């Protein structure tokens, strides 16, 4: 049976111009045996799905393509692909054939040779040069007339400037070989350049930027009168020139791409969230994440891309292992929402200070070390930890993500101030797109692994460029077909970006502030408690005033009883008077104590007055007791005793009047102010 199958397979492939090797033959026969395929139908499917643009293709790839087309789950898995920086394909431009050629066996070591450093700059320059020469402004027609030729310009090599008079256009990398002197370099030489009088309008120019300068070469110095960044190229034009070369990585085959485009249009509700600066060690940030997940629990996003830094402060000196605890806390929050846990793909991009196995902040940055995230991955299987920068392919769209504070860096190192007519973010994006590089600062300012500089390339331009920056949110839609955006810092204002790939629309949102609402409620409770305390104090004061009035009424009633009252009533009357005076003294002391915060001198005088009144009252009370004892011993002196008693009462009343006159009226506003 196997021999008959082999003959039939060999004959079918040879009729279509293909030859099949022994290992491919074995793979097909195993499929027929194990899965019961009809051999004729299987061969037809294989031949239909062979990519004719490639001369060599594996049978395993064809089977994978067939399974992908026939399975909706496989399409969903193929919809999102993450390409880390160290798996980015390398293509070198061949100046002779004017094509990009893939380099299969390039040096992948982190510590490149000296040639790697020089090749780094050459590759950057050639990539921009070939694109600029194809620009309409520099593409002179072959059979053009002299008049028509004057409408076009050419890029003059720097080595041809000597003895070549007139206004010229040059393209080169600006550098500073000598202090206070700028140079412009190309592949062969460098010349001094004077930019003091140059007109510059759009973009940012830093040391190491590739610029296009116009001017004259005089006495060994190129006097530039105009400087601009190289022209960009529309994405569709670049793809047409590349002739289906996959410089991005993980590009699916034609049949799969058709299915992915169909899937992309059908899934209109699929969304991708972008968050930057997600501090997992901050309680308030975790609260906002919890609140954010709660808002998407019924309609989970297709993917969530979380960019570092993942801690507020760098974890150094042995504290790196705390990151494991923080990711476990995040896993617990995600597990609270089953839909998000089941359907959302989480992608983590490290920030500048995150521990990634290297103490040096060199680009590309490695993923977060597995020792910190292995528990998280076991709890959240649909999670991917990738490099910084990284590339993401969603169906037919290519996305580049880079987490760095580029705005501040470029401002510090710019040598030509950008115009104020546009936002600084527009100048930054123009620099990135025109130089086809994410960060073209000097290697001293921003070190890069020499052998992996191609991972920082932005050529061809992606559909979406995401820069995770601490600056304010921005989004720019460019004429060349690239959409750029910055979700801003989630830890600062809890802002994030909501992207819908089906219609390429962005929505900027902010996580609500539940803790602030709680704080507002707490503030309201405190205000209510203060009001209640004020009301209680007012009620106490009213009760005290009522007690005073009642005591005064009782005293007046007892004063009117006259001589007919017996000695026991006299003692009760005197005791009531003493209690009344004591209450007044205590009340007065309390008021003085509160007023002491406002005016200490007046309080001291009032306290002394109150003490004098207290002493006088005690003396009157002693005299009163002595008179009562004398009345008990001598009943004959009853009239004298009554007169003495009346005299005592009159004296007490006079003292009370003096106290009331001396006592300042209570300022209720000040008292309420003091209580508050």
Curated annotation (Swiss-Prot):
Biased composition (Acidic residues): 517-550, 562-575, 633-643, 651-666
Assembly and oligomerization: Consists of three subunits: pole, pole2 and pole3.
Compositional bias segments (type: Basic and acidic residues): 551-561, 667-676
Region (Disordered): 513-676
Keyword Transcription: no
Family: Belongs to the DNA polymerase epsilon subunit B family.
Species the sequence originates in: Dictyostelium discoideum (Social amoeba)
GO cellular component terms attached to this protein's record: epsilon DNA polymerase complex
Function: Accessory component of the DNA polymerase epsilon complex. Participates in DNA repair and in chromosomal DNA replication.
InterPro entries according to UniProt: DNA_pol_a/d/e_bsu, POLE2
Name of the protein in question: DNA polymerase epsilon subunit 2
Biased composition (Low complexity): 622-632
Keyword NAD in record: no
Record keywords: DNA replication, DNA-binding, Nucleus
Record localization: Nucleus
GO biological process per UniProt: DNA-templated DNA replication; error-prone translesion synthesis
One annotated GO molecular function: DNA binding
Domain of life: Eukaryota
């Amino acid at each position: 049976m196997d021999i008959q199958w082999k003959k039939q397979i060999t004959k079918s492939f040879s009729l279509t111009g293909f030859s099949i090797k022994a290992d491919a033959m074995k793979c097909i026969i195993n499929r027929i045996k194990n899965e019961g395929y009809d051999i004729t139908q299987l061969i037809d499917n294989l031949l239909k799905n062979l990519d004719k643009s490639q001369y060599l293709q594996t049978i395993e790839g064809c089977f994978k393509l067939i399974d992908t087309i026939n399975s909706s789950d496989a399409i969903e898995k193929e919809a999102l692909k993450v390409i880390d920086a160290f798996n980015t394909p390398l293509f070198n431009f061949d100046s002779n054939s004017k094509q990009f050629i893939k380099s299969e066996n390039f040096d992948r070591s982190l510590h490149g040779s000296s040639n790697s450093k020089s090749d780094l700059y050459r590759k950057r320059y050639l990539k921009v040069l070939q694109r600029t020469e194809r620009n309409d402004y520099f593409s002179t027609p072959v059979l053009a007339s002299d008049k028509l030729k004057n409408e076009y310009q050419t890029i003059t090599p720097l080595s041809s400037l000597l003895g070549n008079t007139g206004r010229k256009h040059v393209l080169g990398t600006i550098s500073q070989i000598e202090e206070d002197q700028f140079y412009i370099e190309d592949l062969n030489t460098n010349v001094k350049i004077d930019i003091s009088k140059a007109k510059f309008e759009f973009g940012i120019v830093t040391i190491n930027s590739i610029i296009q300068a116009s001017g004259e070469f005089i006495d060994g110095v190129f006097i530039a009168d105009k400087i601009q960044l190289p022209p960009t190229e529309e994405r569709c034009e670049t793809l047409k020139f590349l002739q289906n070369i996959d410089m991005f990585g993980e590009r699916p085959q034609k049949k799969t791409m058709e299915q992915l485009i169909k899937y992309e249009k059908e899934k209109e509700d699929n969304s991708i969230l972008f968050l930057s600066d997600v501090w997992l060690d901050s309680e308030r940030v975790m609260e906002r994440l919890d609140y954010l997940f709660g808002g998407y629990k019924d309609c989970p996003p297709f993917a969530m891309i979380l960019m570092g830094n993942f801690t507020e402060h760098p974890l150094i000196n042995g504290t790196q292992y705390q990151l494991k605890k923080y990711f476990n806390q995040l896993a617990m929050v995600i597990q609270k929402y089953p839909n998000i846990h089941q359907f959302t793909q989480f992608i983590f991009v490290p920030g500048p200070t995150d521990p990634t196995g290297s103490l040096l902040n060199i680009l590309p940055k490695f993923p977060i070390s597995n020792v910190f995230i292995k528990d998280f991955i076991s709890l959240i299987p649909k999670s991917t930890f990738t490099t910084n920068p990284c590339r993401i392919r969603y169906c037919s769209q290519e996305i580049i993500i880079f987490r760095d504070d580029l705005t501040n860096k470029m401002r510090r190192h710019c040598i030509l101030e950008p115009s104020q007519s546009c936002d600084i973010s527009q100048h930054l994006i123009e620099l990135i797109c025109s130089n086809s590089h994410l960060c073209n600062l000097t290697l001293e300012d921003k070190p890069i692994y020499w052998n992996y500089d191609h991972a920082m390339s932005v050529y061809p331009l992606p559909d979406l460029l995401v820069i995770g920056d601490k600056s304010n949110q921005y989004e720019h839609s460019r004429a060349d077909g690239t959409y750029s955006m910055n979700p801003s810092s989630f830890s600062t204002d809890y802002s994030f970006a909501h992207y819908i790939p089906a219609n390429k629309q962005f929505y900027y949102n902010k996580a609500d502030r539940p803790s602030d609402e709680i704080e507002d409620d707490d503030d309201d409770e405190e205000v209510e408690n203060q009001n209640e305390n004020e009301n209680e104090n007012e009620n106490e004061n009213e009760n005290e005033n009522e007690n005073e009035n009642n005591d005064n009424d009782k005293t007046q009633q007892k004063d009117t009883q006259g001589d007919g009252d017996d000695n026991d009533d006299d003692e009760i009357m005197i005791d009531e008077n003493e209690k009344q005076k004591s209450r007044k003294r205590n009340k007065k002391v309390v008021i003085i104590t509160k007023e002491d915060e406002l005016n200490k001198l007046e309080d001291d005088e009032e306290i002394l007055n109150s003490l004098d009144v207290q002493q006088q009252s005690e003396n009157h009370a002693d005299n009163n007791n002595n008179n009562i004892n004398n009345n008990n011993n001598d009943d004959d002196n009853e009239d004298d005793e009554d007169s003495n008693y009346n005299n005592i009462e009159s004296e007490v009343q006079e003292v009370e009047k003096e106290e009331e006159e001396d006592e300042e009226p209570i300022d209720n506003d000040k008292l309420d102010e003091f209580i508050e």
